[in-house]
Amino acid sequence: MKMKMILPMMLIAALPLGADAQNKSGLVMSNLDKTVKPADSFYQFATGGWQKNNPLPAAYSRYGSFDQLSENNNKRINTILSELQKKTYKAGTIEQKLSDFYKLSMDVDSRNKAGIAPVKPLMDEIEAAKTKDELQKLQVKYAWMGLGLSYGAGFAADEKNVTMNIYNLMQGGLTLGAKDYYLNNDAATVAIREAYKTYLSKMFQLYGFSADEAAKKASAVFLHETTLATFSKSRTELRDPQANYNKMTLAEFKENYPNIPLEALANAEGIKSEYLKEMIVGQPAFFAGYDKVAAAECASTLKALMEWDIICSSASYLSDEIREARFEFFGKTMSGRKEDYPLWKRATAQVDAQLGEALGSIYCKRYFPESSKKMMEALVKNLQISLGQRIDAQTWMSDATKKAAHNKLDKFYVKIGYPNKWTDFSKLSIDPSKSYYENVMACRKFANDKEIAEKAGKPVDKDEWFMTPQTVNAYYNPTTNEICFPAGILQYPFFDPKADAAFNYGAIGVVIGHEMTHGFDDQGRQYDASGNLKDWWTAEDAKGFNKRADMYADFFSNIKVLPDLNANGRFTLGENLADHGGLMVSYNAFKNATAKKPLKNKDGFTPDQRFFLAYAGVWGQNITDKEIRNRVKNDPHSLGKWRVDGALPHIDAWYEAFGVKQGDKLFIPKNQRLELW
């Protein structure tokens, strides 16, 4: 594709990747499947060898290069934790907390001996309550745990006044996540629903109830969740930021939902009423429905719901029998996994989940060189310049909207590698004399108290990170207009300092472009340069954007991911726009960066071909059919295959690079190719 270079080349940052001419291609030839024409399935051509050489491990429902990198990261983290075991540390130090928590997570024998003992006092206290009033008093007593409450709550930026935090309420209460699992009647969904009923009953029995008692409690929970599903918003509907922003005063909330004792619960949790004067109620219709359900439900149902919440929050931290029962449903039935992860991996993941930033500080000192951060900073600068050029190239946009888009782009807050300041864990106590479950709950209570202390009535801290440094991922946050690239993702196959620009722009470059494009996707475009939910588009430009976005939604909705199942292009719209935009922006940046010193062919491929092969290589994976069904309902990203074979056929440069022509399976006529950014 011919690009117009709007900005002078001297503004492109010099990327410190060494002498590109001498750098390797970064490609692994055994990952390819050259028996397939690139134009018939580029995904298979670029990743078929990888798929063959990396069969799906029994513990995974999906295993791809993302997961492979995560596994390598887990080994690094496990090495850190194993080394910590070799010494004794003073109580209260971060090393003591990490070391003792890891020991607890590895101590299966103690958990198997204890059974449900760690949760039995709380379960008994709830079971002993005779009336609804007594149960509601227990809800207040344990308010921070949210027992029997079918909604989520917490402090976050006020999307129309993003310098301040505000109390947010959102729908919840569905153990299976998506409402579709409760309401759809296709054979696969019905089978999961029936298995869920069995699972509910089994878990109540494992927590000490008779078969008859368990059946009654399971029925109450299932009926409650099914009722909630009827007035819950779909995953797609939850993607509309304007529709999910509804500001209310506390007085209005009480009037609208008299059967939800929000103030009493919040006060008991440590939130003063003055911080509830205004709040955001994400889904008013859901809360109206839930208010009626809460009023009508009897004591026995509320009791079952409270007990079910305890079961859900503890099942992974008690005996193997209980953990395995949970895995049988969520791992095998829902996702198609054949076995659970080994103990060391589960333990490492839990330390990472509960004490991630403490671990991240050690991880970055050991595994993230400053040189990688500098290389990323240069890449990000080049991608920002390129996105500015892509904005200017959009002939359907007015100058006024382009100017506002540039303002937003210029104000991106970039985070790379690790936070500027680390979480203070001094108030968290990890007590090896207590159970694993009790220590997990101590971590959760610490995080909950920390959020209240730092956010209730307080300004937004733009330096807060929403991922740990060792996470293999990246994100864009609209309310701070930030793009974040943790140290964990800055490794092969996303980033290789010894590879040339074709590889790095095709891999990590597209990731950077992807996150930047999120600032201008169907959701992100509704937030201004400061992060406020505020319209900055002319009416005509907004219409033009929506017309183009609708075409993406329709295209991906027509993709069959299984013989009886289509993708949901409306649900995955933001991610599909970011994939396509990321490719366009990074390809343009790649051409900018190599204009004066074009790269040579390597390993039998041109520079442009290597760019697209690097991108596709990121998405190689093997996946079960059950996991495909699960992701179509719950994951806003397209499947790996379609992030390649769905995105690339809309990019002219890919056609030119691989000689794709009419008659090839992936060919789309030029006038039908989609473009937005």
PLM features: residue spans?
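Hydrophobic/aromatic-rich, well-ordered segments within soluble, folded domains that form packed cores
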Residues: N31-K52, Y182, D186-Q205, L573, ...
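Active-site-surrounding "flap" and adjacent substrate/cofactor-binding loops of secreted or lumenal enzymes
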Residues: K37-D40, F45-S110
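Intrinsically disordered, low-complexity linker/terminal regions across diverse proteins
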Residues: S70, N256-N259, I280-P284, T348, ...
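Bacterial Sec-dependent N-terminal signal peptides
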Residues: M1-Q22
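Short, Gly/Pro- and small/polar-rich lid/capping loops
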Residues: Q22-S30
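Noncatalytic, helix-rich "gating/capping" subdomain that lines the substrate-entry/channel surface
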Residues: L84-A378, N382
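Short secondary-structure subsegments characteristic of cysteine-rich extracellular domains
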Residues: A13, A59-L81, E213-F231, N504-V510, ...
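Short, solvent-exposed loop/turn and secondary-structure capping segments
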Residues: N53-P57, A153-G154, A178-D180, S232-R235, ...
